[in-house]
Curated annotation (Swiss-Prot):
Transcriptional regulator. GO terms for molecular function: DNA binding; DNA-binding transcription repressor activity; identical protein binding; nickel cation binding; sequence-specific DNA binding; transcription cis-regulatory region binding. CDD domains: RHH_NikR_HicB-like. It comes from Helicobacter pylori (strain ATCC 700392 / 26695) (Campylobacter pylori). Its cofactor is Ni(2+). This is Putative nickel-responsive regulator. Belongs to the transcriptional regulatory CopG/NikR family. NCBIfam families: PRK00630.1, PRK01002.1, PRK02967.1, PRK04460.1. Ni(2+) binds at residues 88, 99, 101, 107.
Amino acid sequence: MDTPNKDDSIIRFSVSLQQNLLDELDNRIIKNGYSSRSELVRDMIREKLVEDNWAEDNPNDESKIAVLVVIYDHHQRELNQRMIDIQHASGTHVLCTTHIHMDEHNCLETIILQGNSFEIQRLQLEIGGLRGVKFAKLTKASSFEYNE
């Protein structure tokens, strides 16, 4: 018989909330299609842990992962080349890019990045500030372990 992994065990605990906060939690469960309060609370905790992990300013921590979504006018002169130059000059690892044509004027590009939080966020600001970029949103993640 396999011994349960520490990560596999579920611990039950209770939380005290005001009624209006509980009502808001229950509304989000319905709105987002969660099967239980526990599922929503677990996701909220994970999201907060990722947020806190990104807030730790450790230039040697290369465990940050992010996806940068960029929408831009592909008729803007030399914009694509400037975006590529910024990626090459960055201290971040560009793991993958995907480019799609949305319509006759707009392209959407996703850029998957790995590195430290400062370099990733700097790349997002540099690309987002280019003339012709209409949207630049960074979705942050982390590859750190929660059980340490």
